[in-house]
């Protein structure tokens, strides 16, 4: 059993939302925390002592998801109002609006290079967008029901998604095809994510299960039934050794993936927990729930730092490479039962009260005059489908001593002629890439057939020799 010093501890709690907290996300430098809520607001919490929190009203309905860009300069939010907003996480709170889908937008996620982001919606589609040009790229449409979540792999080559059609799908972005499907007949998944190596995905089931799949072998590696209600969210520790889960039963669970067992059960929220996430360094994690609170925890239980674990992984003689399309083939799944016991931690009683006073909250963009649409926003609206949906102009606050700056740099807008030429080149490259992929696949089939023919020839020769 771990010592008390190794147990997770509640560090801070933030109160500012007026309704359920639907999503939480750390900034890349872990100096800020973003949260979204059913109160239709996004909030940015600053960890610096005595700093103010920013509240961004703008969405017309509940905000379903929020995420920092890899650079930390933007925050994306999705909403039931069918839009996605891109915010500057500062006191000015400028935002750009994208009419993204024809139904509720459930999820938004950035690629690791920050060039692309994806959205998932109740319109049964996943859409990819270019961030800097704010241009719609393509849709993935093989799900047959609401898409709850979509996440990039660490290398940006794959997307994992889960839907109310009771499937978890793996998509190859090169071909824009679904290359693998995991079916769960007991219920749909609410959330899905890749581990840090990109070799496994974990799903949070509405049937209260957590499953970890090897996407190279198409095999169920681990199956946990540790919650008493649906699992709403999960997050891999950066080391890849632990998995944090949140559930409607009001608890957070921490799973040791190396030993395949539950090690901690955390009680802190007064109601269903809707979102959890580790910080980039892994030394903190945050949770949000229907009690409108955001809790920030100190990890403590990971005895190795992320840097040490990365060094250990680099020393391996045969590091695991990311999966290739031809590496993924069907296998019969098996269950992995959890073992061991949990350590109950109740922040109200057993953990020292390290909570800070609620920071002052600044309402950014509320009841402010609208400004004229920027060129970037106007350019965006030309390329987004369903333009008949009215897009509000960008609202921002005026603060003395601060210069106005556009959310997206104007220098990123190219002349139409050059833009069309580049698009044609990109389309041609995509065709070439698909052609090469098809040729590789055919070559593989040909090699397999040739190998089979050679084996048959050897068998025939052997039989002929025996007959003689």
From Swiss-Prot:
SMART domains: WD40 (SM00320). Residues 420-459 form a coiled coil. One of its GO terms (biological process) is cilium assembly. InterPro entries: G-protein_beta_WD-40_rep (IPR020472), WD40/YVTN_repeat-like_dom_sf (IPR015943), WD40_repeat_CS (IPR019775), WD40_repeat_dom_sf (IPR036322), WD40_rpt (IPR001680), WDR55_POC1 (IPR050505). WD repeats lie at residues 16-55, 58-97, 100-139, 142-181, 184-223, 226-265, 268-307. It is found in: Cytoplasm, Cytoskeleton, Microtubule organizing center, Centrosome, Centriole. PROSITE patterns: WD_REPEATS_1, WD_REPEATS_2, WD_REPEATS_REGION. PANTHER family: POC1 CENTRIOLAR PROTEIN HOMOLOG B (PTHR44019:SF1), WD REPEAT-CONTAINING PROTEIN 55 (PTHR44019). Plays an important role in centriole assembly and/or stability and ciliogenesis. Involved in early steps of centriole duplication, as well as in the later steps of centriole length control. This is POC1 centriolar protein homolog B. The gene is poc1b.
């Amino acid at each position: 059993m771990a010592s008390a010093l190794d147990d997770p501890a509640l560090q801070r709690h933030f109160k500012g939302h007026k309704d359920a907290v639907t999503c939480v996300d750390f900034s890349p430098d872990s100096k800020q925390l973003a949260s979204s809520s059913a109160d239709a607001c996004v909030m940015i919490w600053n960890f610096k002592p005595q700093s103010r929190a920013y509240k961004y009203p703008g969405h017309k309905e509940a905000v379903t998801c929020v995420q920092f860009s890899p650079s930390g300069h933007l925050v994306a939010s999705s909403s039931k109002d069918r839009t996605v907003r891109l915010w500057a996480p500062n006191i000015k709170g400028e935002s750009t609006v994208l009419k993204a889908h024809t139904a509720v937008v459930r999820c938004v996620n950035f690629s690791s290079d920050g060039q692309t982001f994806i959205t998932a919606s109740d319109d049964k589609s996943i859409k990819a967008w270019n961030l800097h040009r704010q241009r719609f790229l393509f849709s993935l449409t093989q799900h047959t029901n609401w898409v709850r979540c979509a996440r990039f792999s660490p290398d940006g080559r794959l997307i994992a998604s889960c839907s109310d059609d009771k499937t978890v799908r793996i998509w190859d972005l090169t071909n824009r095809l679904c290359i693998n499907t995991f079916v769960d007949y007991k219920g749909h998944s609410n959330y899905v994510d890749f581990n840090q190596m990109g070799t496994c995905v974990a799903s949070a089931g509405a049937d209260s299960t957590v499953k970890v799949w090897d996407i190279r072998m198409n095999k169920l590696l681990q199956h946990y039934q540790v919650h008493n209600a649906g699992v709403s969210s999960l997050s891999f520790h950066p080391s890849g050794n632990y998995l944090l889960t949140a559930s409607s039963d009001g608890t957070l669970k921490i799973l040791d993936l190396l030993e395949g067992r539950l090690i901690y059960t955390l009680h802190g929220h007064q109601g269903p927990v809707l979102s959890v996430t580790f910080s980039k360094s892994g030394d903190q994690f945050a949770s949000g729930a229907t009690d409108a609170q955001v809790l920030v925890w100190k990890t403590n239980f990971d005895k190795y730092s992320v840097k040490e674990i990365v060094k250990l992984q680099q020393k391996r003689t045969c590091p695991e490479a990311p999966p290739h399309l031809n590496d993924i083939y069907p296998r019969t799944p098996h269950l992995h039962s959890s073992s061991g016991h949990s350590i109950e931690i109740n922040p109200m009683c057993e953990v020292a009260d390290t909570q800070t006073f609620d920071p002052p909250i600044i309402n950014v963009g509320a009841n402010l005059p609208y400004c004229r649409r920027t060129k970037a926003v106007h350019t965006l609206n030309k390329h987004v489908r369903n333009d008949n949906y009215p897009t509000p102009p960008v609202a921002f606050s005026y603060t003395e001593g601060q210069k106005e700056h556009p959310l997206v740099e104007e220098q990123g807008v190219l002349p139409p002629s050059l833009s069309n030429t580049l698009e044609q080149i990109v389309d041609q490259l995509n065709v070439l890439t698909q052609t090469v992929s098809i040729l590789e696949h055919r070559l593989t089939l040909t090699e397999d057939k040739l190998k089979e023919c050679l084996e048959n020839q050897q068998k025939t020769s052997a039989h002929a020799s025996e007959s003689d």
